[in-house]
From Swiss-Prot:
Keywords: ATP-binding, Ligase, Magnesium, Metal-binding, Nucleotide-binding, Tricarboxylic acid cycle. InterPro entries: ATP-grasp, ATP-grasp_succ-CoA_synth-type, ATP_grasp_subdomain_1, Succ-CoA_synthase_bsu_CS, SUCC_ACL_C, Succ_CoA_ligase-like_bsu, Succinyl-CoA_synth-like. Binds 1 Mg(2+) ion per subunit. Residues 9-244 form the ATP-grasp domain. The keyword Signal does not apply. Its EC number is 6.2.1.5. GO terms for molecular function: ATP binding; magnesium ion binding; succinate-CoA ligase (ADP-forming) activity; succinate-CoA ligase (GDP-forming) activity. This is Succinate--CoA ligase [ADP-forming] subunit beta. It comes from Burkholderia thailandensis (strain ATCC 700388 / DSM 13276 / CCUG 48851 / CIP 106301 / E264). Pathway: Carbohydrate metabolism; tricarboxylic acid cycle; succinate from succinyl-CoA (ligase route): step 1/1.
Length: 388
């Protein structure tokens, strides 16, 4: 789950991380009122969407008068903000963050992720802040410094100090940087985050260290123990299809292709998409119906996929372990009839009650294309999507 920048800063503030004074605004008048409360002479008007690159897309403006705050708020609110993370369709801006300006002397980067190789939380820091960390990793990997934190001890003062020195924090500001790094680590750990990032972390002209941005992603599987994080959820920022899927316990992610995928198991779902790509096709979605798929779930899965106007074909790829193939076949038949399926459907099933499932499909009277292997299924669905 993602949250907005201003919400991330609320979390950081609770853990002792220095952030600029600011408040969210949901209208132009509210933006001006917040600016008046903060006092000038400089304010930053920032679009709040779940994507990076807002500045380059025109979603961050520096205002030097209340009239400019009004002007920029009017420009940004309601705009369809396009960044490298939103895709060509962009994301509508429904809220702003109005903040006091900062005298920026130097921009740095700090972030925390889980490293699955070392099986530890890794704190990263770089002197090249304000840029996409992926770009820094590609062009100047030596500029990124890392510490794999021992979970039993947490981030130590010496580790935080060493990172701060390596990214160019002056000695006089090291204690501030230490508190920010430790606060960021603690916020990551205690909220079950999967990503915590400050980009940029800035050094100001008077020697202060301040988090000018905040980005958090949270492990959705842990949200049951964090109602305070769930309260931050903004459904306007999420794909309506993914929201609908979650109501039926379906793991669904929209993609840009034209071949729908209905699979049981995340690993098999990813392998299925890879195989479709291998044979020249483009998946329209990731969809894992899980190990307990019912007829209702399969029907809802079909409905979700068919809401995509660009859908040209569907591939159902099932391994019958816990899930019986005859149950899936029953769901496929019922789902196809319920939604009046009007695109080619390729089905490949292996495992428990495989023969019974195939027999049910063959006797259903539906124009279902059968396949025995994943490669054959992918080839057939790619051909069907191309109208061959």
């Amino acid at each position: 789950m993602k949250i907005h920048e201003y919400q991330g800063k609320e979390i950081l503030r609770k853990f002792g991380v220095a952030v600029p004074r600011g408040k969210p605004a949901f209208s132009v008048d509210e933006a001006v009122k917040v600016a008046e409360e903060l006092g000038g002479p400089v304010w930053v008007v920032k679009a709040q969407i779940h994507a990076g690159g807002r500045g380059k897309g025109g979603g961050v403006k520096v205002a030097k008068s209340l009239d400019q705050v009004r002007e920029y708020a009017n420009q940004i609110l309601g705009m369809q903000l396009k960044t490298h993370q939103t895709g060509p369709e962009g994301q509508k801006v429904n809220r702003l963050l109005i903040e006091e300006g900062a005298d920026i002397k130097k921009e740095l980067y700090v972030g925390i992720v889980i490293d699955r190789v070392s099986q530890k939380v890794v704190v990263m820091a770089s002197s090249e802040g304000g840029m996409d960390i992926e770009e820094v990793a590609e062009k100047t990997p030596e500029a990124i410094h890392k510490v794999a934190v021992e979970p039993s001890t947490g981030l130590q003062d010496a580790e935080a100090d060493d990172l701060a020195k390596k990214i160019g924090v002056p000695d006089a500001s090291i204690p501030q940087a230490r508190e920010i790094l430790k606060g960021l680590y603690k916020s990551f750990w205690e909220t079950d985050a999967s990503l915590a990032e400050i980009n940029p972390l800035v050094l100001t002209g008077d020697g202060k260290v301040i988090a000018l941005d905040a980005k958090f992603n949270f492990d959705s599987n842990a949200l049951f123990r964090h109602p305070e994080i769930v309260a931050y959820r903004d459904l306007d920022e999420e794909d309506p299809a993914e929201i609908e899927a979650s109501k039926f316990d379906l793991a669904y992610i929209s993609l840009d292709g034209n071949i729908g995928c209905l699979v049981n198991g995340a690993g098999l779902a990813m392998a299925t998409m890879d195989t479709i790509k291998l044979f020249g096709g483009e998946p329209a979605n990731f969809l894992d119906v899980g190990g307990g798929a019912t007829t209702e779930k399969v029907t809802e899965a079909f409905k979700l996929m068919l809401k995509n106007p660009g859908l040209k074909a569907i591939l159902v790829n099932i391994f019958g372990g816990i899930m019986r193939c005859d149950v899936i076949a029953e769901g496929v038949i019922a789902g196809s009839k319920a939604v009046n399926l009007n695109v080619p459907l390729v089905v490949r099933m292996k495992g428990t009650n495989e023969d019974l499932g195939k027999k049910m499909l063959a006797e259903s009277g539906l124009p279902i294309i059968s396949a025995d292997s994943m490669e054959e299924a992918a080839q057939k669905v790619v051909a069907a999507a191309a109208g061959k």
